Amino acid sequence: MASGKATGKTDAPAPVIKLGGPKPPKVGSSGNASWFQAIKAKKLNSPPLKFEGSGVPDNENLKTSQQHGYWRRQARFKPSKGGRKPVPDAWYFYYTGTGPAADLNWGDSQDGIVWVAAKGADTKSRSNQGTRDPDKFDQYPLRFSDGGPDGNFRWDFIPLNRGRSGKSTAASSAASSRAPSREGSRGRRSGAEDDLIARAAKIIQDQQKKGARITKAKADEMAHRRYCKRTIPPGYKVDQVFGPRTKGKEGNFGDDKMNEEGIKDGRVTAMLNLVPSSHACLFGSRVTPKLQPDGLHLKFEFTTVVSRNDPQFDNYVKICDQCVDGVGTRPKDDEPKPKSRSSSRPATRTSSPAPRQPRPKKEKKTKKQDDEVDKALTSDEERNNAQLEFDDEPKVINWGDSALGENEL
C-alpha cells in the first residue's frame, strides 16, 4: 500500500473526485490517508472519542448499509528545541476494511480505535471505499447530520465549496455540527477586540462563498442603485459607493483603512451588528419629513443601546473611536512599522496549513545534542503532521449575549 508520497504512483489515470464541490468522496485511491479531515482533542491525555450521534461522517454517495467504520487515534508531536513536544491527539476516520486497521473486523478491540456505525449499517460487510492519496486529493470537510463529537474535541472548519488550489483557513469548529465555526489561532491577532473583527470578517467571507458570484454588472448595480439602498460590493472602496468620508456631518463613519478595504475590513461587519433593520429603522426611529426644493427629505433618528455588560462593549467603543470622524487616520496597529530582520520576510504563514519548520541548527553541537536531534520526528510522523495545524485552543466569545443576538449578522 502506497504511503501517499511520490513512491508507489502508477501511470494509471487518477480517479476523478470533486472534493471541492458539494459531493462527498466516491472512490478510493492508492494512498493510505483518511478521506476526511481530522478531529482534534482540545487537551493532552483527553478521554476516548465520543459522539452525540452515530459518529459516521456524512457521505451521501454511500448506502446506509455501508455507513460504518472506525476512528483511529494519531499521536502528534511538535518540533521543538532538542527534540519534539507532544500536542493533543488527532483522530482520523476510515471505513471498515480500509486504512491502517484494514485487517480488523468491525468491533474488534484495539487500543486507539473507536468503532462507529449509522443506524441500519451492515457492520459485517467491508468497504471498497479505499483510502486517499494526499498528493492527489484534499481532505473532505467533516459534517455530522446527527451530531458531532463531545466537548472534548473540535475540528477545523472547511467550507464545502473549497477548491484544491485554495487551502482552508484554520477556523476551528465547535464540538458539534450545529455550531460550525470560530476563528483559529493561525494568523490570529491577540486580544478580544481582534477576535471580534476576525469573526466578523469570517462571517462575510462565508456569506460570499455561499452566495452566487457577483459579476461586474451586478457590483456596479449594487453601488449605483438609489442611495438609501446601496451596498458595498467586494473590491469597492467606501467612498466609491457613499462618497468621501467627512467630519461632523453625514458620511462621517470610516477611517482611511476602512475606506480602502471596504467590506474586507472586519470592523464593517462587526458594526453592522448594531445597525437597525429596515423595519426597525422605519418603526423605531423618530421620522422627520421635510419638503425641500429638490424633493421630500426624510430624516430617521434611531438609537442603538449597547449595554456596558455586553461582552463586546469595549470592542464597539474602540471601533467607534477609530471610525467616527476617522477620515485621515488609521488604526494604530495598521501603521507601517520599521523593517526588521524578521518582519522583512514574506508573511506567508497565515495562508499555509503546514506546521512551522524548525530553523536549521548551527554547526557546533555536542554529542548529546546530536542524539537529541536523532529523536526528532520520524518520516511517518512528519507525513501525518503535514496535514495538521499545531494550533492552540481558540478564544471563546459569548456572542449569544451580545447587543442584538447571535443571528443578527
From Swiss-Prot:
Q: Pfam families of this UniProt entry?
A: CoV_nucleocap (PF00937)
Question: What is the protein name stated in its UniProt record?
Answer: Nucleoprotein
Residues of the CoV N NTD domain: 31-156
Give the residue ranges for region: RNA-binding.
29-160
The organism's lineage is: Viruses, Riboviria, Orthornavirae, Pisuviricota, Pisoniviricetes
Q: Which superkingdom, per the lineage?
A: Viruses
| GO MF annotation list | RNA binding
Q: Where is this region: Disordered?
A: 1-32, 46-69, 120-193, 238-259, 327-409
> What is the organism field in this record?
Avian infectious bronchitis virus (strain KB8523) (IBV)
Compositional bias (Basic and acidic residues) at which positions? 180-192, 247-259, 368-384
